[in-house]
A protein has these predicted regions:
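C-terminal peripheral helix-coil segments that are non-catalytic and often amphipathic
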Residues: 1-7, 141-156, 181-232
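Arg/Lys-rich, glycine/proline-spaced intrinsically disordered segments
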Residues: 8-13
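Generic hydrophobic, amphipathic alpha-helix propensity
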Residues: 21-31, 47-48, 68, 72-84, ...
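Helix-turn-helix
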Residues: 25, 33-71
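Hydrophobic alpha-helical connector segments
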Residues: 71, 85-113, 117, 172
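Amphipathic alpha-helical packing segments from all-alpha helical-bundle domains
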Residues: 81-84, 121, 130-157, 166-173, ...
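Amphipathic alpha-helical segments used for helix-helix packing
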Residues: 98-99, 110-134, 148, 181, ...
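Cytochrome P450 catalytic-core helices
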Residues: 176
Length: 232
C-alpha cells in the first residue's frame, strides 16, 4: 500500500515554473528520467534536482524511488481498468466485437496520453525486476482478464477454443502496447492509427472485416459517452 505524505515540503532551491502540485512535479520529473535514463540509473537526488527541490523534500511526498515507480506504472493501466464496467454496460446490446474494439480504443488512449510515455516503463528490465512491478502485475492482470473475457465472447470458434482467455488477453494487450513503441519513435497516435491497432486486435481473434466495420463504427460513437480523461 502506498504511503502518501501530506506535509508541506521545504522551500524550493529553484522556483517552480508550473502550477502542478509538488507531488505531480516529482512524478513528472521521475517519469522523464526513468524513461530516458532508466529506473536503476536514476537517483532520488537527480529527481529532486530536476524538480528544483532539495532531496530531503522529495521524501515528504514519497518514501523512495520504488513508490514513485509504482504510481507511474499504475497510471499506465488504471484509467482503462476503471472503465471496463462502463464499456461492457455501454456495449451490452451492441455485441462483444464492439466491446473489444471500444476497450482497445480506451487502452490506446490511456497509453497515448500517458505523460512522458510511461507505458514504456513496463518493458524495461530494471523495472520488471523491481519490487514496484510486483504490485503492478496485479492491476495489469485485471486488464488482461477483461481483454480475455470479452475477446473469448467475440472471437471466432477456432480462436476461442485454441487460446485460454488469459493468454488471449495478454496477446491483445501486447498488440495495443505497440502504442508506446510508436510514441517513442515519434509517430503520432491519431484516430487513424488507433483504428488500425483496434482493428488488428479483432482480426487476431479471427473476426472478419464484415463484423469489424460495424463494430468500429459503434465503438467510435460510444467512446464519446465514456469519461475520457488523460492520466495525470
Amino acid at each position: 500500500m502506498s504511503i502518501r505524505r501530506t506535509h508541506p515540503g521545504r522551500p524550493r532551491l529553484v522556483p517552480s515554473n508550473t502550477a502542478a502540485p509538488p507531488r505531480e512535479q516529482v512524478l513528472h520529473a521521475a517519469a522523464q528520467l526513468f524513461v530516458t535514463k532508466g529506473f536503476a540509473a536514476t537517483s532520488t537526488r537527480e529527481i529532486a534536482d530536476k524538480v528544483g527541490i532539495r532531496q530531503a523534500s522529495l521524501y515528504y511526498h514519497f518514501t523512495g524511488k520504488d513508490e514513485i515507480l509504482a504510481e507511474l506504472l499504475e497510471r499506465s493501466v488504471r484509467p482503462t481498468v476503471e472503465r471496463v464496467d462502463q464499456i461492457e454496460q455501454l456495449t451490452a446490446s451492441a455485441g462483444p466485437e464492439t466491446a473489444l474494439y471500444l476497450l482497445a480504443l480506451v487502452d490506446i488512449h490511456t497509453l497515448a496520453e500517458a505523460p512522458d510515455n510511461i507505458g514504456m516503463l513496463a518493458t524495461h528490465p530494471d523495472v520488471t525486476s523491481s519490487e514496484a512491478f510486483d504490485a503492478f502485475r496485479s492491476i495489469r492482470a485485471e486488464l488482461a482478464d477483461a481483454y480475455g473475457r470479452i475477446a473469448t465472447q467475440a472471437a471466432a470458434p477456432g480462436v476461442a477454443t485454441a487460446a485460454e482467455p488469459g493468454h488471449l488477453g495478454e496477446m491483445l494487450m501486447h498488440l495495443v502496447e505497440v502504442t508506446t513503441t510508436l510514441r517513442s519513435s515519434g509517430a503520432p497516435i491519431d484516430d487513424a492509427t488507433a483504428a488500425v491497432i483496434a482493428s488488428t486486435c479483432l482480426r487476431a481473434c479471427g473476426i472478419p472485416d464484415s463484423r469489424i466495420t460495424p463494430a468500429a463504427a459503434s465503438a467510435t460513437t460510444l467512446v464519446g459517452e465514456l469519461t475520457m480523461s488523460a492520466p495525470t
